[in-house]
Amino acid sequence: MYRKDSIIIEEWLKRSDKALLVTGARQIGKTWLIREEIAKSGYRKFEVNFIDQPDLVDYLNVKMSANEFLVKLKMIMPEDCKPQETVVFFDEIQKCPEIVTKIKFLVEEGSFKYVMSGSLLGVELKGITSVPVGYLTVLRMYPMDFEEFMIANNVSKTTLEMLKAKFETCQPVDEFIHQKLLWLFFIYLIVGGMPDAVKIYIATKDIREVDKVQRDIVALYKEDFSQYESEDKKLKLISIYDIIPAELNKQNKKFVFTMLNKELKFDRYENSFLWLKDAGVALPVYNVEAPVVPLKASKSSNVFRLFSNDTGLLTSAYPAETKLELINKNSEVNNGAHFENAVAQQLTANGLEPYFCKKKNIGELDVLVEMDGKVVPIEVKSGKAYKAHKSLDNFMKISDCHIEKAYVLSVANMEQEGSVVYLPIYMCYLLKERKIGKLIVDLDMEGL
């Protein structure tokens, strides 16, 4: 299946003289993609998986010089793994984090190219004291976004190019195509972007089979909670993770700590929230006090909404009736939790950091992001009244905010009224920062 990150790995294999670290949550396709790109590149691959080969953890994860490490590594490599022709792939690196500290030497020595991958790296690498800055490229992967899901479901390149053109010119999509893509988006809300779930959907079209895959993935996540943390912290992590669907289903989607424990104070659970974020299984979207650049400067670390890393995993936690309503595109039902989770997931995958903003006497903005140096508000509407956005109108009138353009995502077709663009929800994947090519600054200093 097509993954956008394949281009990054392909470019790294061709040109980079650094090591590559691919991180992200479990089951998002990291290992598969690395193997695919190495196979296409013509390089020989030597792979070490520290879960499947636990004896190699003791062999390589001990205190030794970088030179000793390289000697030991070469001793377990086949003879046909020749220098300059081989990529060494360390998988499940969270089990052997000491290797990260050796990367600077290994890169400088130059015999092989090195790629590392694993889950929970945001958690496990926090204890590493010597991360090789300047010698390591980090690629953060996410579940498949809606564009990748469309490609997996045989949406043509011509259609994708048409959507991009319509987005750039604010022109409506042909109604027949619009309805087809809207239906596919509702399917995406159920299936999500976990590659195994997408594969089983494409093969069977059976949502029940998809649900089995999703429940297995959730079970793996909870197994990780147990494997890497104490019993007390494991229970906190499971409690927080399990309550995400209920919290998002409320009208006020802000995470309320007393839902976990009436006596709870945020600082008792703060590390658990951060653990879920660092592990890549949850996406916190923080409140900001001021909708101005930089948004991060006014974020409230204890006021946030907590989303699932994958809309399909979120939907799997709801009753079967919820899936039927989504399949039927029932706009009378409140699908706000699913829509907002999908938007948070997509914006994050696009490299943006979503926030929300709630201010007295003005209202609440669903999403705020920074794009091209400007604050862009985004309203997410799952019902028919998508043009009713009083809070957005209030924010647009505040001169201090300097808001030039806003988006309303809904099931409606594309149109623009003033500075508000009404965007079909399936076009969310097109909201990203513009790519800047070469920026050459050539100053003539002669004569100074």
Annotated model-derived regions:
Residues 30:
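Conserved lysine of the Walker
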Residues 412-448:
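Domain-level recognition of nuclease-like catalytic cores that cleave nucleotide substrates
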Residues 126-249:
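Interdomain motor-coupling "hinge/lid" segment immediately C-terminal to the ATP-binding subdomain
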Residues 52-83:
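Short glycine-rich substrate-engagement loop in P-loop NTPases that contacts/grips substrate
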Residues 194, 199-365, 369-372:
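Accessory nucleic acid-recognition modules appended to NTPase machines
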Residues 33, 37:
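Hydrophobic positions on the alpha1 helix immediately C-terminal to the Walker A/P-loop
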Residues 113-119, 140:
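Structural recognition of the conserved hydrophobic beta-strand(s) that form the central parallel beta-sheet
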Residues 1-14:
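Pre-Walker A adenine-sensing motif
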